[in-house]
Protein backbone atom coordinates (compact mmCIF):
# COMPACT_ATOMS: atom_id res chain seq x y z
CA UNK A 1 0.00 0.00 0.00
CA UNK A 2 1.36 3.43 -0.92
CA UNK A 3 0.18 6.77 0.39
CA UNK A 4 1.30 9.79 -1.60
CA UNK A 5 1.07 13.35 -0.36
CA UNK A 6 2.50 16.50 -1.94
CA UNK A 7 6.13 16.88 -0.80
CA UNK A 8 6.48 20.18 1.12
CA UNK A 9 10.02 20.89 -0.10
CA UNK A 10 9.83 19.43 -3.58
CA UNK A 11 12.07 21.16 -6.11
CA UNK A 12 10.54 19.37 -9.09
CA UNK A 13 6.85 19.09 -9.84
CA UNK A 14 7.05 15.30 -10.11
CA UNK A 15 8.40 14.90 -6.58
CA UNK A 16 6.22 13.37 -3.91
CA UNK A 17 6.53 12.03 -0.43
CA UNK A 18 5.74 8.35 -0.42
CA UNK A 19 4.83 6.29 2.61
CA UNK A 20 4.80 2.55 1.98
CA UNK A 21 3.65 -0.48 3.86
CA UNK A 22 4.86 -3.56 1.99
CA UNK A 23 3.74 -7.03 2.88
CA UNK A 24 5.44 -10.18 1.63
CA UNK A 25 3.16 -13.19 1.30
CA UNK A 26 5.48 -16.16 0.73
CA UNK A 27 3.60 -19.29 -0.23
CA UNK A 28 0.28 -17.48 -0.63
CA UNK A 29 -1.77 -18.09 -3.76
CA UNK A 30 -1.89 -14.74 -5.62
CA UNK A 31 -5.37 -15.43 -7.00
CA UNK A 32 -6.76 -16.07 -3.51
CA UNK A 33 -5.06 -12.94 -2.15
CA UNK A 34 -6.52 -10.87 -5.01
CA UNK A 35 -10.01 -12.23 -4.36
CA UNK A 36 -9.73 -11.51 -0.64
CA UNK A 37 -8.50 -7.97 -1.29
CA UNK A 38 -11.45 -7.31 -3.62
CA UNK A 39 -13.86 -8.22 -0.82
CA UNK A 40 -12.46 -5.70 1.67
CA UNK A 41 -15.11 -3.01 2.35
CA UNK A 42 -12.75 -0.13 1.47
CA UNK A 43 -11.86 -1.72 -1.87
CA UNK A 44 -15.09 -3.43 -2.91
CA UNK A 45 -16.38 -0.44 -4.91
CA UNK A 46 -13.04 0.49 -6.48
CA UNK A 47 -12.40 -0.76 -10.00
CA UNK A 48 -9.14 -2.71 -10.29
CA UNK A 49 -6.62 -1.62 -12.92
CA UNK A 50 -4.27 -4.22 -14.42
CA UNK A 51 -0.76 -3.12 -15.42
CA UNK A 52 2.26 -4.93 -16.84
CA UNK A 53 5.49 -3.63 -15.27
CA UNK A 54 9.11 -4.13 -16.18
CA UNK A 55 11.65 -2.44 -13.91
CA UNK A 56 15.36 -2.11 -14.62
CA UNK A 57 17.44 -1.01 -11.63
CA UNK A 58 20.80 0.69 -12.17
CA UNK A 59 23.88 1.14 -10.02
CA UNK A 60 27.62 1.64 -10.38
CA UNK A 61 30.01 -1.34 -10.21
CA UNK A 62 30.86 -0.25 -6.64
CA UNK A 63 27.13 -0.15 -5.77
CA UNK A 64 27.33 3.51 -4.79
CA UNK A 65 23.56 4.05 -4.97
CA UNK A 66 22.83 1.03 -2.79
CA UNK A 67 25.36 2.28 -0.24
CA UNK A 68 23.52 5.62 -0.16
CA UNK A 69 20.20 3.76 0.22
CA UNK A 70 19.06 5.25 -3.08
CA UNK A 71 17.66 3.63 -6.22
CA UNK A 72 17.51 4.62 -9.88
CA UNK A 73 15.17 2.68 -12.12
CA UNK A 74 13.55 2.65 -15.52
CA UNK A 75 10.02 1.31 -15.63
CA UNK A 76 7.96 0.28 -18.61
CA UNK A 77 4.28 0.38 -17.79
CA UNK A 78 1.50 -0.93 -19.98
CA UNK A 79 -2.12 -0.70 -18.94
CA UNK A 80 -4.54 -2.97 -20.78
CA UNK A 81 -3.83 -2.91 -24.50
CA UNK A 82 -2.60 0.67 -24.30
CA UNK A 83 0.73 2.15 -25.24
CA UNK A 84 3.81 1.37 -23.15
CA UNK A 85 5.15 4.33 -21.16
CA UNK A 86 8.67 4.59 -19.77
CA UNK A 87 9.35 6.32 -16.46
CA UNK A 88 12.66 7.10 -14.78
CA UNK A 89 12.54 7.21 -11.00
CA UNK A 90 15.08 8.29 -8.40
CA UNK A 91 14.33 7.20 -4.84
CA UNK A 92 16.38 8.48 -1.92
CA UNK A 93 17.12 7.06 1.51
CA UNK A 94 14.14 7.15 3.75
CA UNK A 95 13.04 6.48 7.26
CA UNK A 96 11.05 3.62 8.72
CA UNK A 97 8.73 4.03 11.67
CA UNK A 98 6.36 1.38 12.98
CA UNK A 99 6.73 -0.65 9.79
CA UNK A 100 6.02 2.28 7.46
CA UNK A 101 8.72 3.36 5.04
CA UNK A 102 8.91 6.96 3.83
CA UNK A 103 11.34 8.21 1.18
CA UNK A 104 11.68 10.87 -1.47
CA UNK A 105 10.76 9.96 -5.04
CA UNK A 106 11.26 11.88 -8.30
CA UNK A 107 9.71 10.50 -11.47
CA UNK A 108 9.81 11.66 -15.10
CA UNK A 109 8.69 10.28 -18.45
CA UNK A 110 11.67 9.27 -20.62
CA UNK A 111 12.32 7.74 -24.03
CA UNK A 112 12.05 3.99 -24.37
CA UNK A 113 14.45 2.11 -22.14
CA UNK A 114 17.10 4.81 -21.78
CA UNK A 115 18.28 6.71 -18.73
CA UNK A 116 17.96 10.47 -19.23
CA UNK A 117 20.39 12.70 -17.28
CA UNK A 118 18.10 15.70 -17.91
CA UNK A 119 15.37 13.95 -15.92
CA UNK A 120 17.69 14.02 -12.88
CA UNK A 121 17.75 17.83 -12.83
CA UNK A 122 15.83 19.21 -9.88
CA UNK A 123 16.37 16.01 -7.90
CA UNK A 124 18.91 15.15 -5.17
CA UNK A 125 21.13 13.43 -7.78
CA UNK A 126 23.89 16.10 -7.56
CA UNK A 127 24.05 15.50 -3.80
CA UNK A 128 24.45 11.75 -4.35
CA UNK A 129 26.91 12.01 -7.27
CA UNK A 130 28.97 14.95 -5.98
CA UNK A 131 31.91 14.52 -8.35
CA UNK A 132 29.74 13.68 -11.37
CA UNK A 133 31.39 10.31 -11.97
CA UNK A 134 28.54 7.89 -11.27
CA UNK A 135 26.35 8.65 -14.26
CA UNK A 136 28.85 7.28 -16.78
CA UNK A 137 29.33 4.13 -14.66
CA UNK A 138 25.66 3.19 -14.30
CA UNK A 139 24.67 -0.24 -15.58
CA UNK A 140 21.64 -2.50 -15.07
CA UNK A 141 22.05 -4.63 -11.94
CA UNK A 142 18.69 -6.44 -11.82
CA UNK A 143 15.21 -6.46 -13.38
CA UNK A 144 11.72 -7.24 -12.19
CA UNK A 145 8.68 -8.18 -14.24
CA UNK A 146 5.23 -8.26 -12.73
CA UNK A 147 1.53 -7.96 -13.23
CA UNK A 148 0.08 -5.30 -10.96
CA UNK A 149 -3.52 -5.08 -9.81
CA UNK A 150 -4.08 -1.58 -8.47
CA UNK A 151 -6.98 0.08 -6.70
CA UNK A 152 -6.75 3.80 -6.03
CA UNK A 153 -8.52 5.39 -3.07
CA UNK A 154 -8.53 9.16 -2.53
CA UNK A 155 -8.95 10.26 1.09
CA UNK A 156 -10.86 13.37 2.16
CA UNK A 157 -7.58 15.29 2.64
CA UNK A 158 -6.51 14.57 -0.96
CA UNK A 159 -4.02 11.84 -0.06
CA UNK A 160 -3.99 9.02 -2.58
CA UNK A 161 -3.79 5.50 -1.27
CA UNK A 162 -2.78 2.84 -3.78
CA UNK A 163 -3.59 -0.70 -2.76
CA UNK A 164 -1.51 -2.93 -5.00
CA UNK A 165 -0.94 -6.62 -5.55
CA UNK A 166 2.19 -7.35 -7.60
CA UNK A 167 2.86 -10.86 -8.86
CA UNK A 168 6.12 -11.34 -10.67
CA UNK A 169 9.77 -12.29 -10.72
CA UNK A 170 13.25 -10.83 -10.16
CA UNK A 171 16.23 -11.47 -12.46
CA UNK A 172 19.82 -10.57 -11.65
Each language-model region and where it sits:
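Phosphate-end processing signature that detects enzymes handling 5′-triphosphorylated RNA
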Residues: 1-172
Amino acid sequence: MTIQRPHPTAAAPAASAEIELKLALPGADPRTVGEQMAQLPLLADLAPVQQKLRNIYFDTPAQDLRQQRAALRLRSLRQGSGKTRWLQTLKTAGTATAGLSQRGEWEAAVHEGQLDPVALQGTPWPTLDQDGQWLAQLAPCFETESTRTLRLFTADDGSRIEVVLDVGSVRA
